[in-house]
Regions:
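Flavin-dependent oxidoreductase catalytic cores
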Residues: 1-345
Length: 345
């Protein structure tokens, strides 16, 4: 079972990956979605999206864009870099992205246009010896099982090797629980058809208990993709790996509890952000991370407000130091592994 970091704008950059790696890392790190057109024009900030630290061999480059030629050229460029492969974003529902013809718009366009995109991008990625994957949703609000599985047929017939399904529709976002049973149906459908595609589940997995629930709802999946929970708890992958009975990459016995230093972990993220991101990105990246990370303490709203109001490296370091100086009992968080390993049905 692969454990995978989901692609998240302003979050899944090298600083977060480095913070996760402190706790043993994960199997695949999807990047922030990279705008194909901007990458090709060589914008001043594009190089910051191309760092592969700390584990280059585990990088999955996710691209987005509404124009086929730019997507193909971006895929060609990224296929020559370190990493597992290239992923097309067909799931983002942000209005600006959809209006540009990118993200989930590819699931809603005239089928022939999307077929052409998949054929051409897949050819350059596989030609470079890299894996070709797609991240998608169920479709629009009026989707049917027939239309969804027909779309999967198209992907499979054009050489997609892995799909990550976020089982919500375009408008559902996080308002309702993900329909995990569709992931299980997708696994069975692919098996019945004999397609050589791995299925990854994405949606509301936060810890070992929710991972176990997801696996029972969707037997046969090849991996679990974790998003926001990895920002709140960069050690979440380690917890789940322990529950799976896997080697966590740590010297400690995987059955033993482990202690997280919340001050040091937060400070580590800030220091890594300074190393891997331009000053122009500090505010958005700090605010985005600490909006989630603050939930680890008792007075989360208080700490979050202080951090979001001081969105500079110096400001965040100071606020973290002051908070834990006033509440030293909250600094060290003991994480206990489950009493038993996953009982997957």
């Amino acid at each position: 079972m692969k454990l995978i970091l989901a692609p998240m704008a302003t979050l899944t950059h090298a600083a977060l990956r480095s913070t996760i790696a402190q706790f043993g890392g994960c199997d695949e790190y999807y990047t922030e979605m990279i705008q194909a057109g901007t990458l090709l024009t060589g914008g001043p900030f594009e190089k910051y999206y191309l760092f592969t630290d700390p584990e280059p061999e585990k990088i999955v480059w996710q691209i987005t864009g509404g124009k086929i030629p730019a997507m193909v050229e971006a895929a060609k460029m990224l296929s020559q870099m370190d990493g597992i492969g290239v992923d097309i974003n067909m799931g983002c529902c942000a209005p600006d992205i959809v209006r540009s013809g990118a993200g989930i718009a590819w699931m809603l366009k005239e089928r022939r246009e999307t077929e052409e995109l998949v054929e051409q991008v897949g050819a350059v990625v596989r030609g470079a010896g890299k894996r070709f994957s797609v991240k998608l949703r169920l479709g629009d609000e009026d989707f049917t099982e027939e239309s969804f599985f027909s779309f999967v047929d198209m992907l499979a017939q054009r050489g997609v090797q892995q799909v990550a399904l976020h089982p919500r529709t375009k408008k559902e976002k996080y308002r309702r629980p993900p329909r995990l049973h569709y992931v299980g149906q997708l696994v069975r459908y692919i098996e019945e058809k004999g397609y050589a595609i791995q299925v990854v589940l994405n949606g509301n997995v936060q810890d070992s208990e929710s991972a176990c629930h997801a696996m029972n709802q969707s037997p046969g999946i090849a991996g679990i993709m974790i998003g926001r929970a990895a920002a709140q708890k960069p050690w979440a992958f380690r917890q789940i790996a322990q529950a799976l009975g896997r080697d966590t990459g740590r010297e400690e016995d995987r059955s033993e509890p482990f202690t997280v230093d919340l001050l040091e972990t937060g400070c580590h993220f800030v220091r890594e952000l300074e190393k891997f991101q331009p000053q122009e990105f500090y505010k958005t990246r700090l605010q985005r991370f600490f909006a989630f990370y603050s939930d680890n303490v008792q007075f989360a709203h208080h700490l979050r407000t202080r951090l979001l109001n001081h969105p500079t490296p110096e400001g965040c370091l100071q606020q973290l130091e002051e908070y834990f100086a006033a509440a030293p009992h909250e600094r060290f968080k003991e994480e206990n592994p489950p009493h038993e390993q996953f009982n997957v049905l």
